[in-house]
Curated annotation (Swiss-Prot):
It comes from Bordetella petrii (strain ATCC BAA-461 / DSM 12804 / CCUG 43448). GTP binds at residues 12-14, 25, 53, 71, 101. Belongs to the MobA family. The keyword Transferase applies. Monomer. It is found in: Cytoplasm. This is Molybdenum cofactor guanylyltransferase. The gene is mobA. It catalyses: Mo-molybdopterin + GTP + H(+) = Mo-molybdopterin guanine dinucleotide + diphosphate. It is an enzyme of class 2 (transferase). GO terms for biological process: bis(molybdopterin guanine dinucleotide)molybdenum biosynthetic process. Keywords: Cytoplasm, GTP-binding, Magnesium, Metal-binding, Molybdenum cofactor biosynthesis, Nucleotide-binding, Transferase. The N-terminal domain determines nucleotide recognition and specific binding, while the C-terminal domain determines the specific binding to the target protein. GO terms for molecular function: GTP binding; metal ion binding; molybdenum cofactor guanylyltransferase activity.
């Protein structure tokens, strides 16, 4: 069993937001507060400590009361760059990640990921949901061993950026969540307005 104090939570808010017109998705208002704050309020009770990966508006994220770390790679290099800085700054054996634009993910997300990671002696546990009759992995909703940092850095230094290609190099377990709507995100302003 993995204790939550051995897990650091990371909110991934370092994207370019290109499908939302280039605006900072994590700072967009949802039910009276920024989406990243919703994510933080859901994630913080599930982990020992939390932090944010962001590449702009750092002061706004710092005002949420947790450490904020920008990518070490230039040009909005994608979620793996955020994972890398999270693993570099993580002081616990495990890192849990969630995106900033999904404000309703399950309150037992980390507990369930940790349970399966330990049970199956995996390196990475990822959430998976049923969509159109197919089980679909949600790789940015994951829990991983911080010992994977050298592997990720080598992968990024080779010029690769695809999260699925990196996770495929490790022992992964998918953890099925029945409520696919809990993982609904807002990639566009229209999707943000449609979130319940």
């Amino acid at each position: 069993m993995i204790d939550k104090t051995d897990i650091t939570g990371l909110i991934l808010a370092g994207g370019r937001g290109s499908r939302m017109g280039g605006i900072d998705k994590g700072l967009q208002n949802y039910q009276g507060m920024p989406m990243a704050m919703h994510a933080l309020l859901r994630l913080a009770p599930q982990v020992g400590q939390a932090m944010v990966n962001a590449n702009r508006n750092l002061g706004a994220y710092e005002a949420m009361g947790v450490p904020v770390w920008p990518d070490n790679l230039p040009d909005f290099a994608g979620p793996l760059a955020g994972l890398a800085v999270g693993l570099e700054r993580c002081e616990t054996p495990y890192l849990a990640t969630v995106p900033c634009d999904c404000p309703r993910f399950p309150l037992d997300l980390v507990e369930r990921l940790a349970g399966e990671l330990a049970r199956q002696d995996a390196d990475i546990a990822m959430a998976a949901t049923l969509q159109n009759g197919q089980l679909r992995t949600q790789p940015v909703f994951c829990l991983m061993k911080t010992s994977l940092l050298p592997s990720l850095l080598a992968f990024l230094q080779s010029g690769q950026r695809k999260i699925d290609a990196w996770t495929a190099m490790h022992r992964c377990v998918e953890v099925r969540f029945d409520d696919a709507a809990a993982f609904a995100g807002a990639n566009t302003l229209a999707e943000l307005q449609q979130l319940p």
